């Protein structure tokens, strides 16, 4: 059955630029992974976005897409938009250019459709803040360079509804010639159904590590970075900062098998796999950067870390130590305040609230203290404003944020790129959900990169901070090795 009907869409078509048309099929013989393989057989540009609760219960939806109709990327103020034609130009405000594109795709929401029905999928790099804070002078000294923003526009979506055991196929159509476009959408939905049910699956190219992972900082060097950070804290420049350590190895093949391992060993609230012509990224992020659903903003600060115990008894003992650790609580509270401040920039007066505070969440190798901050977005702001307000997260930079970013840029050896940035989607209807780019790997030009960091405050012990970076990188590195 095709929904909505043409008659239903005709009633509302004058209010919108595009409308979604969908078809449901059974999902009993397909999985997100084998559908992804079918998509990879016909397109080098694909994505898979999934979610798992921390108790290992899978979220309701998995979203897949291929063959974007537009690609949007910007690096060092040089912006490119690739569609039927390609344009490249210089800009100081890529957000404005992205907004112009999204404004051409105003779409309604239907209760029977999933949370994402089409829009932009991709990432905003950590260094994207250079456009909202021009005084930050990021020099691009990295041997392999990542775009400041890289987004793909998908007007077709394949959504697995794991609760109803169905696949929802979605095609977005323009409203200017509705009946013609509706009939075309029916044909495209049937073609999508055939692709999902019978499409030839691309073989999974084995990912191969061709060298051991090498850290940018030795343990001693990283401990020195921690001490230098603490010197800035003692001078009163900052209260906290989050230095990081990049590991890299020579690599060939695909990260898809590593993603399959992550799905089993480290299910997390944000599971993602994205592939482009010259880049692949995958990860299992525990942390929302910012989420906007029907006017409600949310962010979920995570700060305060302990390793997982060997058994339930040790887990509970570690949890008790963590929740009573003054240093970890002070670090967490600072970042909750920073999250409130970020949302406060674009929220209605007195609407920002901490709705969950000091909750322990367990993941495969570590446990964290988590909180939830919510606010109601002001009508003059949108999803892109929310990303600009929150990026990069205080949990990946520090407090005060701008001074912490300046210090980290001085102390770290390479730009962060996607690490500490935002990964996810911006929906045609105005909603958005992006996670922080952590617990992830990026493969590009024969290298694979894994980066991790930890919050440093005045009482931090340098050796412990180095070990925290090891613990946080462990699940991703193990997934690559097992794949």
What are these regions (language model features)?
Residues 1-483:
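Extended alpha-helical targeting/anchoring segments
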């Amino acid at each position: 059955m095709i929904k909505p009907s043409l008659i239903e869409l005709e009633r509302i078509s004058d209010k919108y630029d595009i409308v979604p048309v969908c078809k449901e099929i059974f999902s009993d013989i397909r999985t997100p992974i084998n559908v992804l393989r079918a998509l990879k057989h016909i397109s080098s540009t694909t994505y898979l976005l999934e979610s798992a609760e921390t108790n290992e219960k899978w979220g309701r939806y998995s979203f897949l897409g291929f063959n974007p109709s537009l690609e949007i990327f910007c690096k060092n103020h040089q912006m490119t938009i690739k569609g039927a034609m390609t344009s490249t130009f210089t800009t100081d405000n890529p957000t404005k250019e992205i907004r112009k594109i999204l404004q051409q795709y105003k779409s309604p929401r239907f209760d029977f459709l999933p949370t994402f029905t089409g829009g932009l999928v991709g990432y905003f790099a950590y260094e994207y803040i250079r456009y909202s804070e021009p005084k930050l002078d990021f020099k691009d000294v990295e041997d392999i360079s990542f775009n400041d923003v890289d987004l793909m526009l998908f007007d077709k979506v394949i959504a697995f509804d794991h609760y109803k055991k169905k696949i929802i196929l979605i095609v977005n159509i323009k409203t200017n010639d509705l009946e013609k476009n509706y009939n075309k959408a029916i044909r495209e939905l049937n073609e999508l159904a055939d692709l999902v049910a019978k499409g030839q699956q691309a073989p999974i190219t084995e990912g191969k590590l061709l060298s051991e992972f090498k850290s940018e900082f030795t343990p001693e060097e990283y401990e020195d970075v921690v001490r230098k950070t603490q010197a800035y804290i003692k001078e009163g420049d900052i209260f906290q900062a989050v230095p990081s350590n990049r590991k890299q190895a020579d690599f060939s093949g695909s990260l898809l098998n590593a993603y399959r391992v992550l799905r089993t060993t480290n299910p997390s609230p944000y599971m993602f796999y994205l592939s482009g012509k010259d880049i692949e990224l995958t990860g299992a992020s525990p942390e929302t950067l910012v989420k906007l659903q029907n006017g409600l903003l949310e962010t979920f600060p995570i700060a305060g870390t302990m390793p997982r115990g060997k058994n339930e008894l040790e887990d509970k003992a570690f949890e008790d130590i963590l929740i009573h650790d003054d240093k970890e609580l002070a670090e967490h509270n600072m970042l909750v305040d920073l999250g409130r401040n970020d949302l406060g920039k674009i929220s209605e007066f007195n609407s920002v609230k901490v709705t969950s505070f000091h909750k322990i969440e367990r993941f495969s190798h570590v446990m964290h203290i988590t909180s939830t901050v919510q606010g109601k977005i002001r009508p003059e702001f949108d999803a892109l404003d929310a990303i600009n307000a929150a990026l990069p997260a205080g949990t990946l930079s520090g407090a005060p944020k701008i001074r912490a970013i300046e210090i980290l840029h001085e102390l770290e050896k390479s730009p962060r790129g996607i690490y500490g940035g935002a990964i996810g989607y911006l929906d045609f209807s105005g909603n958005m959900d992006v996670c922080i780019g952590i617990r992830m790997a990026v493969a590009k030009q024969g290298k694979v990169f894994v980066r991790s960091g930890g919050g440093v405050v005045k009482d931090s012990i340098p050796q412990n901070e180095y070990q925290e970076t090891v613990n946080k990188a462990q699940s991703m590195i193990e997934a690559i090795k097992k794949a």
